[in-house]
Amino acid sequence: MGEKNSSKVLTTGFGIPVGDDQNSLTAGNRGPVLMQDVHLLDKLSHFDHERIPERVVHAKGAGAGGYFEVTADVTKYTKAKFLSEIGKRTEVFVRFSTVGGEKGSADSARDPRGFAVKFYTEDGNYDLVGNNTPVFFIRDPLKFPDFIHTQKRNPATNCKDPDMFWDFLSLTPESIHQVTILFSDRGTPATYRNMNGYSSHTYKWYNEKGEYFWVQYHFKTDQGIKNLTLEEAEKIGGSDPDHATRDLYEAIKKGDYPSWTLEMQIMTPEQAEDYRFDIRDITKVWPHGDFPTMKIGKLVLNRNPTNYFAEVEQAAFSPANLVPGIGISPDKMLQGRVFSYHDTHIHRLGPNYNLIPVNAPKYSPENSYQRDGFMRVDANGGSGPNYWPNSFGGPSPDSVYLEPPFGVSGLAARTLYTHPNDDFVQAGNLYRDVMTDYDRENLVGNIVSHLSAAQKRIQLRQTALFFKADRDYGSRVAKGLELDIKEVERLANMTNEERARATER
């Protein structure tokens, strides 16, 4: 049997001591395995069920723990307790990820990066579920399943499909801003430590007086922005597909703690009402010249997970997890995510995923009437009442936590989104005014490399969108793809419906 080499005795999952973990119970030295070898059966059965469903998006990720510290007074904007005083620290857990790839995909893939922060506050958990880009591809959640399908694998070939990818985007002009960011070098960050994080959505802050404000979050990396070129990303993807995961873990392990400065953009309801575009449209940014940022805090990651599955894989973030002082806006995509994230966690982790330690509130006891369900691993409410109202001392609502009201109006209907905000202006401004010559050269090269694999009719349709954003932008892509620039310009002058008909198969 060999000598015992540990003070700990190996047991089954139920705490029963194990005498031998190397040899199955058999009939004789070379005989068949006996069905009564319950240790073997238990070990194999647990192994058979080790894998849980991977996330439908953001499957590949890394995470770490740390803290958030307030550095500015924001009490006139929000009554959130974790933001109530300068110097206050709140424990956090952060998960970074790619979006479209599977769990084993490369960290260097051209893809937005998830940037999700869980704040363990005294009023429960607050989840800020953002990306490393300030905008997104679509503004209506009804389009989200279709969009994600195009970013994954062809249902027939099971391969990534440039036709699917670009067909959807070229038929969805609102995506042009995010596409321009994605195919810049910011679409391939060097590491998770060298990228920013954004709420992307507009959220609502409200104070003790019941006044509310619209806000956006910007986590600016203190390590500096560093990106990979197309060639660098492809090389690293082949030689070290887990490079960003490893980089984060090793930096924290040696005490080189990454940090981000939280900057906020804040707008009054009156400013929003009169602004030149819909400030809740996730395909747009708020110009910093109109709404400068305000530094309010510091995010620091100083603790590696002790077990990846327990903390990172089982971590579940939801934009529905809001604490008093913070609310959602009428952003359509945000309202869709408020449902969808919680729903997918139930599928992946079960209805009691909030009891998993990484997801459980640490500084605010859970006092709800939720009971039973798979993996209810706490006292399940004990002998207390499981309904409200009751007269047996159960927890009761408190109106002090109600959000202040705000007005909404309109006829209920499925209507085309309309607003005087051209979908191409900000993409053009980004190309002309923000990017350098080097940035523009890489952007065009990255697009041509990927779009060239799609059908020519799709190339023409998508290049027309680049042309609408900026003439030079579209012309350079057309040249790289060897397209007729006159045909591109003709398509650019059409409506979206006309352009779709003109480029049908």
Swiss-Prot record:
GO terms for molecular function: catalase activity; heme binding; metal ion binding. Its EC number is 1.11.1.6. Its cofactor is heme. Heme binds at Y341. SMART domains: Catalase. InterPro entries: Catalase, Catalase_3, Catalase_AS, Catalase_clade1/3, Catalase_core, Catalase_haem_BS, Catalase_immune_responsive, Catalase_sf. It catalyses: 2 H2O2 = O2 + 2 H2O. GO terms for biological process: hydrogen peroxide catabolic process; response to hydrogen peroxide. Keywords: Heme, Hydrogen peroxide, Iron, Metal-binding, Oxidoreductase, Peroxidase. Pfam families: Catalase (PF00199), Catalase-rel (PF06628). One of its GO terms (cellular component) is cytoplasm. The active site is at H58, N131. Decomposes hydrogen peroxide into water and oxygen; serves to protect cells from the toxic effects of hydrogen peroxide. Belongs to the catalase family. This is Catalase. The gene is kat.
